Amino acid sequence: INQLNINYLNKIPLRAVSGNSIIAETNFNSNHIINKKISVINTSRKNIHAGSTYHNGFENNGVDKLLNKLDEIIKKEYKVKKINFGIRSASVDREPLVGKHPTIDNLYIINGLGSKGVSQSPYCSKELFNYIELNKNLDKEINIERFIT
């Protein structure tokens, strides 16, 4: 929440979004990130991370919804080991924000990934690298300039 008040981010259209995620023990294994309304990732041979729910504001009531979605995806037994609640930044249009800060030279941003950060961060990182090092244009859907110009 404090990032919304940090001076160098005050021109960036971010908002706070809350949600739940879980760590569960299961024999489900995948080498891929599964992204079907929630993300499911193996963190070890026996554990998965599943999340996240999405609430505007600060509601800690998404665990049942998360478990129902997980049941649909993995179709295997699991034991919940840990329930997490967190707050993350999201852009106002729920798309990533990538690019050069509008007023501070040499400050580049990847933010606003919300709950899809695990699946979108590799793409956003590559886009930013190509922008900085190869002078390529950023994908207009993630370019922070869509809010700044």
For each predicted feature, which ranges?
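Active-site substrate-recognition segment that forms the wall
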Residues: N2-D105
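C-terminal catalytic lobe of FAD-dependent flavoproteins
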Residues: K79-T149
